[in-house]
Amino acid sequence: MKSKIYKIISLYSFFPFQEKLIIDLKNKLLEIENENDLSGLLIFAREGINGTICAEKNVIDIVINLINKYADYRNLNIKVNFSKKKVFKKLKIKIKKEIVTMGVPEINPSENNGTYIDSTDWNKLIKNQNTIVIDTRNHYEVSIGTFQNSINPNTRNFSEFPKWVDDHLDNHLEDKESTNIAMFCTGGIRCEKATSLLKKKGYKNIYHLQGGILQYLDEISKEENLFEGECYVFDKRVALDQELEKGSYSICHACGMPVSIQDQKRKEYRKGIQCHFCIDQFSDDDRKRFEERQKQIDRLKVENHKIYKD
């Protein structure tokens, strides 16, 4: 029997999205989920759409066509990947104030943002001595892979980025008027919104990597690749390597940090219970709960394996 191949689509678009249409699209997508093997996470807001979906190709095509209609065929940024396994359990659709939370309501990325730089021109830009490169992702994402010589704002979440800009960005600029500011993220959405923030604050020469790290790795040859390490992703794969295959990292289910194969060999590591990042963060009662949860997970895996063999 031929095994299924799942198509994984990461997508986003900034556009004015009316509340009535948000509800309508959500209901139609849930109908598709009921009839098909569709999973993922989608976030809808008045500023647009963001998310990742996973299904077989024919189902993905139906969903993308539907979303394009509601987005009025505006520029829907899409990254494609494939997997032999589902990377989400089910479809979740969330309606929020923002499709990526920054907490600065006065900016409007659909009307005012920086200049897209494609993968081919990105290397030239970041090698320019008059360019600073900023990784707009969270610190735990940066810790497993980033571009050479990029600045890590050490944020725990994207809503901390505006404060970092206010407190630290000018320290990295020799000349606010002439220095190029190049920003990147996983798929393009956070760095695009970050450019809108910087333009609102009066910064010039603002650029962002079109399609983010994922598109860059897909388009740039191994010899020209300036990205070092693996790229964190928000699904069961945890991280992708340079070939966009599942990487070497797992997740610590206690604290959510990515842990490498080497990390899992450390004496502090206990699967599902703790790692060296969080050993001092939780109480003994917390660890007992985590241990019981891990036992339940392991039992379910054994039961599912038996069902599959039978």
UniProtKB/Swiss-Prot annotation:
Gene3D superfamilies to which the protein is assigned, alphabetical: 3.30.70.100, Rhodanese-like domain (3.40.250.10)
Ranges of residues in domain Rhodanese: 127-225
Domain of life of the native organism: Bacteria
Known catalytic reactions: uridine(34) in tRNA + AH2 + O2 = 5-hydroxyuridine(34) in tRNA + A + H2O
Function: Catalyzes oxygen-dependent 5-hydroxyuridine (ho5U) modification at position 34 in tRNAs.
HAMAP family: TrhO
Protein name per UniProt: tRNA uridine(34) hydroxylase
